[in-house]
UniProtKB/Swiss-Prot annotation:
The keyword Ribosomal protein applies. GO terms for molecular function: rRNA binding; structural constituent of ribosome. The lineage of its organism: Eukaryota, Viridiplantae, Streptophyta, Embryophyta, Tracheophyta. Keywords: Chloroplast, Plastid, Ribonucleoprotein, Ribosomal protein, RNA-binding, rRNA-binding. One of its GO terms (biological process) is ribosomal small subunit assembly. This is Small ribosomal subunit protein uS19c. Belongs to the universal ribosomal protein uS19 family. One of its GO terms (cellular component) is mitochondrial small ribosomal subunit. Signal peptide: none annotated.
Amino acid sequence: MTRSLKKNPFVANRLLRKIDNLNTKAEKEIIITWSRASTIIPTMIGHTIAIHNGKEHLPIYITDRMVGHKLGEFAPTLNFRGHAKSDNRSRR
């Protein structure tokens, strides 16, 4: 179910404050965040945001095509290593 259009997109206040401060200073630095549920808004374009995947922070460069998506979509949490191999040979 999508978010109501009457509401604004969710962005964590702390993350929004950090981005606004960097935009007023015209600086670029990596912003570390745990807020995977935050929506990418146009003021974030051009910044690098390190998104937590449960183990480490993955730096993601925000482009204009990412606007409207959530930060968590770009930091995968699961690492599938393949199904276990069958050990039928060793059992014989």
